[in-house]
Structure formats: C-alpha cells, structure tokens
C-alpha cells in the first residue's frame, strides 16, 4: 500500500529484483528508494536506517554475511557460550541480539524475504531461534519468479514455504525412495517457452 516503504538494492535485471523491488512495489503504490550503489554492508546499513523499509527483499549472501561477520564471532566467545547455557540469561541474550539485528534492518519491517539461493542452515536456525522476522521463498525466472512462500510467522525451518494458491507442484521421480526427484510446476505465471526456441 501507499504507506509501505521499500529499499531496492537487488539487480533489476534479475527476475527477483524486478518482480519485487520494482513491479510489486510499483503496483502496490509503495514508496521505493533505489540504492544506486553496490550494496556494501556499510552502504546498505546506512540506507536501511534512513529508509526504514516495511518489507525487505534480499538474497542469502547478505544475511549470511551479517551472521558470519557480526553474530558468529560474538557467539563463539567462551564467555558467550557459557552465558547461552544459563537458563533465562540465554533468552535475554537472544532477545537482545534479535532487537539489535532488527534495528540494523531499520526496525520497521514486517518481514525480510530471502530468495535467489539456498540459505545457510546454521544461519537459518539461529535467526529462527531468536525470533527474527524472516522467511525464505522459492522461485525461478520462468515462473515470474515466485513458486512458494510463507509469511514469517508460518515459516517452517529448512522449507521454502507453501506453493502459491494459483500454482500446482509435484516431484517426479522414477524411484522416490532412492532417487532425488525433479520439481515440476504448473500455473498461470509459468512461461510457455523460450523465445525462438521451437
């Protein structure tokens, strides 16, 4: 809606960035700020604190970098490992980390939507444990680009949400018990084919 704010920093030449940082924001009347620079951590954090987006579309690389460079070193300290094993103190520490992380992303977002690649399971588990408002979606360019998504409060660990109501999906495998299958989807947003590729 017109009260929502978006900070666009994904490449608009890619389906994910084009669909959500541009088209969805445009169609919803969202106020969109385009970063216009390569999103280094410093530039991105400054922009997030100024824009205070209400929804954030990002890729795993950015979330994982924050986890690896800022959170993980703190968690690996001997004193922190000890404190995280003390009942009540652990929940206070995790709540504080969530609060600071939420502030880092501008403090006003409804959820951070991660897509474009798989999220590191360790980072995903940690963010879920602290109650960070994030979700992981799945899609591909050929599906304009979304296939599945769940809102953060419904999101299950190591999943990519529920298949969209306008789509059908199934996994094909000759031997489902022993062989990884292929995900196939059908729906109004799936392209018919490639240009001049009869």
Where are these regions (language model features)?
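Conserved AMP-binding/adenylate-forming
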Residues: 56, 93-198
